Amino acid sequence: MHRSTFLTGSAAALAVRPPKAQTISVADLVYSFPGIIGIYCRTLAPEPPLVAVRASEQFAAASIIKLPIMLTVYRAYERKTATPNDYVTLLPGDITEGAPILGDAHSGQRWPIGTLVEAMIQYSDNIASNALISHFGFTAINATIRSAGMTGTLLARHFAGEVPPGRRNLNVTTPRDIGVLLYAIERGAHEGIPTVASPASCRAMVQLMLGQQYREMIPAGVPRHVPIANKTGELDTVRSDAAIVDPFSEDPYILVLLTRDLEYPGLAYDEIAAFAHRIDAAIVRMDR
């Protein structure tokens, strides 16, 4: 899918603005959305974002904050302070709900780092994520976050099945921050240059994300033949997704959709897919 003509964005107008004064609005979707949504979308071109709605506002990160944890791991691989075959011992505090791969695991078990990263990204396994947080540490992960230019993002707690209301928003991020991270990863992979990691690490992270098992949001709004490397995040009133769309094409793009205060969380999947469909269709039309 060729996407060589780019759009420009305006948060104030809540619209996708392609060149030549045409406007493809997303305002109707934003205003009818049953909650609060933040959007960030851009291509690899050195242009303003295609769409930027609440792009710098903080949202509960949910599992999307597992992306900078992944980056921390791959940077450790590059420094040779860790390898995918190194084993991590599960601690009592790592055990929690939301673990489709490590659900039967118990403290004291040992798991390879490579297996933990795959479970964290592709299955959003919380025990795997907690084990990586415990192993690499909050300080190192937040240093990765800062060095990637993610100024509105913070990892402040482990993942838990039931989170008290006052602690739900301790892990925070912004649509722009996640977009900046995915842009850097895709640019490194696509252009073969060092960005937040080496080109080889960036390609490996894209490949890992392409194995994502949860495809109900952004992927559901894009034609099925288009490859999508994405990471989802969910809390009780949060459904979010962040993706590199068509990462191997001439014109990949980044799309981040973060939400909060959803009135009907179960219906948000289709709503988010509708945003993805609108934006993707706009990009394709402008390429004709």
Regions found by a protein language model. Give the residues of each.
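Active-site SXXK
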Residues: 60-88, 120, 255
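Conserved catalytic neighborhood of penicillin-recognizing serine enzymes
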Residues: 95-130, 138, 171
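Extracytoplasmic
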Residues: 34-36, 54-56, 62-64, 83-85, ...
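Beta-lactamase-like hydrolase cores
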Residues: 18-60
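N-terminal export signals
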Residues: 2-21
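Structured C-terminal helix/loop/strand segments within mature extracytoplasmic catalytic/sensor domains
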Residues: 5, 22-28, 33, 50, ...
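Active-site helix/loop module of the DD-peptidase/beta-lactamase fold
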Residues: 81-111, 140-160
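Mid-domain, small-residue-enriched loop/turn segments at the edges of structured enzyme/sensor domains
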Residues: 36, 130-190
